[in-house]
Amino acid sequence: MNVSLKWLGTLVDIKGMNPDDMAETLTVDGIPVEHVIRPGEGIKGVITGKILSVEKHPDADHLLICQLDVGEEEPVQIVTSASNVKAGQIVPCALSGAHVPAAHDNKAPGGLRHGDIKIKAGKLRGVKSAGMMCSLGELGMDANLFPALNHDGILILPEDTPVGVDIHSLYDLDDVVYEMELTANRADCFSMIGMALETGAIFRKKVTLPSISVKEEGAPIEGRASVHISEPAYCKRFCGRLLENVKIGRSPEWIEDRLRSNGIRPINNVVDAANYVMLEIGQPLHTYDYDKVAGHSLTCRHAHEGEKIVTLDGQERQLNPSDLVIADGDDKAACVAGVMGGF
């Protein structure tokens, strides 16, 4: 499990505390922090800029000359080989003196960066260039966690991104994330609220839990949808709620940032909400399309002998009779209970 200190700071008062000292104290007190990850580590002096114009290089067909507004009195000129740039776009700019990571390793804890590149002004085929515009990879950002951003060429930022701001202020690159190595006896800490309560107890800090309220309206759910438990010895509670008139779209940026801090790829507001709640309170949950659930009924049961399921990652999985599944009204397994949904 990962713990974003920005997120944690909304639940418990950790303002002014040193992240490394906090990690050491938590570890000594039985809440081991395996790694302290700084997502923006290796990025220095990279700011946002707006492309004012794009012209062809006079002596190189594969190069373009861009004039950019980076929040200074005069525009800066950057020469690039990227073909996806055009006037009006907001892009990350690493000007002379800036630093960017040399590499991004998805297999390392938190996608740790290796090496460092210092940007210098220079000339490309005789034309001055004040630095470089950056791609996702050049900023050390895991493309898998940013499905809404372009993965090829220069990173094109949302059009409402302010000009001249440090890239660290975007996508929580200025966050600090703990990669936890929690043991089975501390399952209470496998959630942000659990970590907030533990952090508050250890450091004697005030904890403020989110206020939750639900307004029920519309037709009663009775007769429209139902849930059942066929294995009460293994599933103590199974409940559901029917949500109507849902418009599927992109989640707010702050939710996407919090999911990314845990290595979870944002999908859409429905899937993201389920993943967010799981991280916040530690309770796995899954969303189903009401129109596609046979019989509008769900039952928690053990898997049948030889039963298989195709999970959301596209993999066909052989189930064991000891596995709990959620089955629809046709008795087809629709989800591996508490683990992963299926088709």
Which residues fall in each region the model found?
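A short, flexible low-complexity segment enriched in Lys/Arg and Gly/Pro that occurs
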Residues: 97, 166-176, 244-249, 305-323
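Glycine/proline-enriched, intrinsically flexible loops and inter-domain linkers
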Residues: 5, 11, 24, 64, ...
